[in-house]
Amino acid sequence: SYLFIYKTNLLYADQQSYKLTLLSSTVITFQYITQILVLILFHNYTLYLIVLLVSTFFNNFFASKIADKNYPYLRQMEVSELTTYEKKNIIEDVKSMFIYKSGSVIMNYTDNILISIFVGTIFVGYYSNYLLIITMINTFISIIIRGITGSIGNLIAEEDKARTKDVFYIFTYFFQFIGIICTSCLLFLFNDFINIWIGSEYLLDNATVIIIIVSFYITCINNQNWIFREAGGLYKNVRLVMIIAAIINLILSIIFGYLYGLSGVLVSTLIARLLTLCWYDPLVLSKNLFVEKFKYYLLKQFKYFFILLIVIFMDWLIPYNNVTTFVDFIIKGFFIFINSTFWFLLLNIKNKDQKNMFMKIKYLLNQVLKK
């Protein structure tokens, strides 16, 4: 797929990645539907992976065609030799990225192996049911991330640190909005959905479900850190921290997995992330991109966390009937979503980042209407 996909980097750098959004959404939707049908009809994991492979190929192939259409000069360009300085920088950046990504793989993809060892393969399946929902949410969030990373890179290149800081906190607000609303909805709807979908025998205990949801929340509210770090090319600054996080995760997962099973493995990943990346990433950004006191960022995040607790409490106060059908689930989900959104917006009514966010949305809508 790399023979095709490299061209699409131009679309991201040129802030034209929205042209890939419809393609990505269509392919992902088709992929999920086909994978579900394959598992139901054939119970064959190999076919499941083949669907993933084919979907990835077609997504990258057509994305490449979109890039060719937008930048026809790609077919006519003469290839020139890179300077020694350029090669040195590229090699150094690739080394840093390789170290970081290697740590990321250990950090994010060892849980299932350890769960299988300490608890059993059947619990990997139980956990995967919940993880599938989280993955679907994160997939659509990633589409948003891909669409804005290029514009953030351009912003950083302009070296306007005050503007960079303001935009960073707008995105902090945005991902807190997504994180808080989704967290509250998951807290009150997760087990209901699993129960209706595949049955009560596949439900995990409440403590484990809460750990899964908290992990999702922590990941979501750190998206702006990862976006600005990647756009700013700061892999050198954080590469060793990811390795440290991976080592902490592996050690804790072995200890807690042996003692507490599934919940022990999952909470180990959460602890490792909190002890390293969650505070070090924004610290690096505050020192390198917008020269902001780190405590200001922490104060904002604690305020948002307090808002999360209030939103959850207000959702808990609403009486709900037992959810036995998808209609009941949709009705309950609707009220939780509306109530969560209302309280989040109300509690942020004096937040300048919320005001800036609405101004940005209003500007974009006006631009669309003018066209």
Specify the residue positions occupied by each region the protein language model found.
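Interhelical loop/hinge segments that connect adjacent transmembrane helices in multipass membrane
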Residues: 45-49, 61-108, 151-166, 284-302, ...
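Transmembrane helical elements of multi-pass membrane transporters/channels
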Residues: 27, 51-63, 67, 83-154, ...
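Helix-loop junctions and terminal segments of transmembrane helices
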Residues: 12-13, 72, 134-172, 226-231
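Interfacial transmembrane-helix starts/ends
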Residues: 91-94, 128, 160-177, 181-189, ...
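Membrane-interface junctions at transmembrane-helix termini in multi-pass inner-membrane proteins
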Residues: 1-24, 46, 213-245, 259
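Hydrophobic alpha-helical transmembrane segments
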Residues: 21-71, 131, 244-248, 262-283, ...
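Interfacial segments at transmembrane-helix termini and the short loops linking adjacent helices
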Residues: 187-217, 263
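Membrane-proximal transmembrane or re-entrant/amphipathic helices at the cytosolic face
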Residues: 293, 315-371
